[in-house]
């Protein structure tokens, strides 16, 4: 899955539980891929491998269930 598609999907998923779903999605993805946020804008076409996508899905599920960003980020 491309980075831009992953962000769009995550934003949609978080829209019911977050006041800032796009920002949350970007921050969680950056944490998952261990890159700065600017990387998402510079390389939207980069692909996520299956393992990274699974880890991203795990943190999204935590956020969807209402876990605060600060707790997820550690």
Where are these regions (language model features)?
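Non-catalytic nucleic-acid substrate-recognition regions in nucleic-acid-modifying enzymes
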Residues: 1-20
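Conserved AdoMet
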Residues: 27-74
């Amino acid at each position: 899955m491309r980075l831009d598609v992953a962000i769009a999907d995550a934003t949609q998923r978080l829209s019911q539980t977050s006041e800032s779903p796009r920002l949350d999605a970007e921050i969680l993805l950056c944490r998952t891929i261990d890159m700065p946020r600017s990387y998402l804008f510079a390389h939207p076409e980069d692909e996520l491998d299956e393992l990274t996508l699974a880890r991203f899905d795990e943190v999204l599920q935590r956020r969807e269930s209402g876990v605060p960003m600060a707790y997820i980020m550690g």
